[in-house]
């Protein structure tokens, strides 16, 4: 093979892209009562359009799934209804493994993705396993955020041909434009676990970047109104603590009662207000115990619902680490400074109390995402007692205000431009901090190439102002069998976003390059 032929083949690989016609489904409005038993026995299921002929995504893309799926949909003034018969050539082999919520485990499952704004940026995902486990989340180009939870209904049933399901998704679980005629992006997924086959109603090519951009169309929804989205949850919590007091030589009891309120309100079809007053996260999952022998702090996952629900906009730029809020007091070790020989610290709060939290987020019909987050942290003091019984208090955490502001504008071809600002303001002469981010993410018209860059600026205001910067630029080919990435990243030695962000270390320059050849065709060996 001569050089000219080699170059020609390589050029074809670079520009290769599967082309499939976008599928569509016309949904009808029907007033019908459903007996949620997972069986499609009601007459309405027999009169609606069928979505079938799923295309395999993995292990080998492009073939029609050998497991037939027949999906039906209709809607009324309150919700969208989905029912499906999922056929299996070996019904006894369907995996019905039970798992926790938001975890498919080792079970067969089916899901639907709904993008009401048809902007291919984010979508609502609803999944049910053959064992009846529900999974929901917000899908984006970064994956699926399963911390998002909604109230919806599902039922599944074993059948002689495989299994079947019924779903009811109320409009209160969705955000959609305020217009009389709706046209949404939509897709269905199915996984047959024992053979690891994943298929979709509208084909999703693994060699093309992004799954939401490869959705089908849902049309036919008309004259539906988004319901009032309002939730008020007052609560009270009591604590009883029993411990041994060495000074008194006996067991002692401590009692504490707290109370607060959570509020969630849909300002309009696009924006939601979340507020919490005197939050109590005592019921959230505890962190794993980690013995840290390294030079860097441990980055923990966020488990508090207020800080994980509806925070996708605040993750832009990578400068918001919510675990900074309500963490150890800012001057936790100050209580150990200037201790006299006859003094000891008898009480030093290990976490700063949260007074309130507020966030507003959403995206307009023109693709402008707006996010505002604010939280106030209370004061803490350590109690120091001397040998004569004298007491004094040392402030370990000042009153602190945390603020995040985000603007993100969607553009053509799933591109975007964003601005993020985080600010930490502490009372008195304590340290303040500010970080600003500008980010540009551009895709070519065919979705094959991507340019992404960001510029970050930090300012730590203490006795003096310490400024720093971070810069990133990259060019990637993100679709096709041949993919590559070239990138550059630098951080100045004074860049410090850690008052409200997380950075292991600064003062570095990184050049990177990668090349991938992805072959999804079936061979004798694979």
Tell me what each language-model feature is.
Residues 80, 271-273, 367-372, 379, ...:
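Repeated loop/turn-to-beta-strand initiation elements of outer-membrane beta-barrel proteins
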Residues 21-408:
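Structural preference for beta-rich elements and adjacent junctions enriched in aromatics
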Residues 88, 130, 171, 190-192, ...:
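Transmembrane beta-strands of outer-membrane beta-barrel pores
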Residues 38, 234, 275, 360, ...:
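Membrane-embedded beta-strand positions of outer-membrane beta-barrel proteins
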Residues 353-355, 361, 433, 446-526:
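Exposed, low-structure sequence patches enriched in small/polar residues
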Residues 246-249, 343-346, 388-393, 423-427, ...:
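Extracellular loop and loop/strand-boundary signature of outer-membrane beta-barrel proteins
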Residues 1-25:
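Bacterial Sec-dependent N-terminal signal peptides
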Residues 117-119, 172, 227, 268, ...:
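Outer-membrane beta-barrel channels and translocator barrels
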